[in-house]
Each structure stands twice: as C-alpha cells, then as structure tokens.
Amino acid sequence: MQIKLERNPKHLAWVFIFFTLITFSCNNDNHERKPNFIIIFADDLGYGDLGSYGHPTIKTPYLDQMANEGMRFTQFYVGSSICTPSRAALLTGKLPVQTGMYGKRSVLFPDNAGGLDPKEVTIASALKNYDYSTACIGKWHLGHLEQYMPLNHGFDSFFGIPYSNDMRPEGKWDYARENFPPLPFLDGSDTLGVSLDQSNFIKMFTKKSIEFILENRNQPFFLYLAHTAPHTPLMLSKENKGLSIRGTYGDVVEEIDRSVGEILKTLAKLNIAKNTLVLFTSDNGPWGWANIDGGSSGLLKGNKGSVYEGGYRVPAVAWMPKSIPRVTSTALATTLDLFPTILSQVDKDFEFKSIDGFDITKTLFENTPVRTDVHYYRQDTLIALRHKEWKLFIKDPNPWDDGPKQEDMPLLYNIEHDPSEKYDLAKDNPEIVQKLNILCQDHINSTYKAPSKYEAILPAYQSAYDEYNKK
C-alpha cells in the first residue's frame, strides 16, 4: 500500500520556520560561546629543543604540526629565567618584582613559608567570574602551604606536585637529603602518595588533562598543564625509552610532544578545536649545567637563570584553527601578555590593574606587533632592557663568570642582527645608549617593588637552615 503525501503550503511554511529557528539558535550559540584556553608549560625546555626550532635529532611532529598550522614565535620571552618567578609572571601578568616572587634563593623550596599572595588576581581567578571551569595539572611551585596552592588562586582542581621534581631527599643536595620530606603528589588538597614513580608523570598529567577536557567540553574551560619535564631528574615511561637519537633528554621531549598530540586529537574529536586557543611554551631556558641531561638554547647565549637571550627567550607556538594565522611571527611577545590577551577574548572591557603584560590580540590574530620592550631581571634588580631591536645591559650580566664586569657597562647589542649577543655596539651608538638608559630609569622609578616572599623559613627547618648556611 502506498501512502500519498500531500503538499500543504501551510505545513511547509511552519517546517521552514522551525528549521530556520533551530539553525539560527545553533549558529548563535556557537557564535556566543566563550573560547576555551589551554596553556601547556614545559619545564626547562630550551629555545633550540624542538624540530620546528631547528633541533637536528629530537623529533617533535605534533608540536611541528602545531607550528605549521598556527603561529610560531621566534621572539617570545618569559617574565623570569627561572621557575617560581616565571610561573608567577605567567599567571598574574606582573613582573615578579611586583608580586614579591623573587629572592636570594631564586625559587621556593619545601622549607619556605611564603608563596604567591592569594589576593593576586590570576588568569584562573579572573576567568571564574565568567563561569569558566579551571584546572591546574602538573607542577605548581608558587608556595606549598594551603593558602598559596592552586585551589586558592582560582583553580577548581589541582593534580600534581607542589614544587620541583628534584626537591626531595633522593636528590644530590646534602641539605635536601637531610631535611626535605618525600615529594608529595596531590589531588586537590589530598595527598595521593609520596615519592611516586616519576616515570609515569607525563602520562598521568596527559590522562588527567584529557579527562578534564571531556568533562567540560560543553562549557568554557581553562587548562593550565605545567609539565615537570624536561627538568632533571629526567624521567619517562618505559615505552618511550630509547626512541630518540638524542638520548634520554630527547626521549623526554618526544614524550611531551606525544602528550601534546593526544590533547590536540581530543579537541578535534570533540569538535571544539576551532573554539580552543592552545599555547605551548617553556618556563625558561634549558638547564645548562645539567650537561647531557640539559637542553639547548640553539644559537642564543646563556641558559636557565641567565639574563642573556638563552635564559629568557623560549619556544612558543599558538594554535587555534581558522583564527590564528599560519605564520612564523617575529613580533615581540611574553608570558606576561597571556593574562590580558586571554581576558580580552572574554570581556573586551576587562580592566587590567597594575599589570605589566600587553593585550597582544592583534599579534595573535593578525601578526601585528604590539609590544616593543622586554625587561630582564635578576631577582629584584633590572639588569637589561630590550627596546625594539636593541638590548642594553646596565648591570653585570653574570657576576659569577669571567665575562663582562660592572665596569664594562653599558653593553649594547642589536638582537635582530646578533641574537647570540657577541658584538657590543655601545661605543658606536651613544644616542641609542642614552635613549635606552632613560627608558631603564623610567621603568625602575615607576615599577612597584613588593617585599620578597622568599625570605621566611618554616620553624621546623629554621635551625637546620641556619646551620647549613654557616658552612
């Protein structure tokens, strides 16, 4: 039996209106949905450690794909060339001197009583005002007491370790062997265990990150994935050992690359890649004194802890299909800029108070330069300033080596011509030296210096700390 369908113009009209409304609603929902943000922060990865940055033997196909499909920065900088202050700068958009995240010990240790002030506004705490789900996975290192931990800085969840993976009794430092507790692994404020096998950390962090993305695929989210690698001691899973020509260091970097690949694949499967801004970078330059276990600064001078380019300039790739152009960008940008740039995507009228970062939206989406200056600090002291192509040292770059001393200052380099900082041009360019000197003094005079949060030692460690420092 055949069923005859009659065409009723009125019915067709209502069907047309119904589907039009659904289509409009879906398009409107996609248009208005806030973007997701993922920051993947490697630990001690050097400027020259990725295939897309010229490494001859370390294979990083997923990060290279990110670079090919997005924006590869050649002049991207951190807020400090060492761990704790660099992480504070990324999350707050402020130079560490403004938040007190500096000190003679360079970073926070398990015996420290201080940390990042909970009153500081972070990317996570700001995004919570716009109904974002937020997660910190991996390494924190901004204070291990409860009031300084991620849950008090805008993160809904934390899964990882409170400080560096080498701050444990098993290390080579005699003070740590005698005094530091076993390295704790936390889920929120709960300790899952101590002295866990670090060879599984990259896999654990990746799995947890993917779970977070899956759980929040239908709402805006911010994921801060801060790997503990390739910081020493180098640890990686059994199935990834012995795969890289570069040896163990190469194995670790390649496992991080595969982790990035899994996250990108997850975004694609969920059909949210086009609405997710992913940025991969490093907290500072490579650990130069780790020898074969450390990374490469490429053609740049200096390493982690240095005010030379190799300490401050890091690999960085931004990826957001159909939004971020496929280009190698020579524009200046820094981790300080991530806070204002991310918040401007959510609220164009967001008020940024007392921050040092710039909104580099035009750089990210149009490859238009915005930033002109980079400040290089050692603890709370400005050592050098980059202004456009010129970099001026006003203080001794490294008082512990046989290089230039304070009496040799100032030093002037054309960074675009001489990224290795070999040729001092100060005597040939007195007007440029004078101009940059004025910029340095203006910056020093206008920058608030907060008291250091590093100095206080927990009472349980004070006597051992004092005894050790008598030696």
Residues of each region from the PLM?
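Bacterial N-terminal signal peptides
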Residues: 13-23
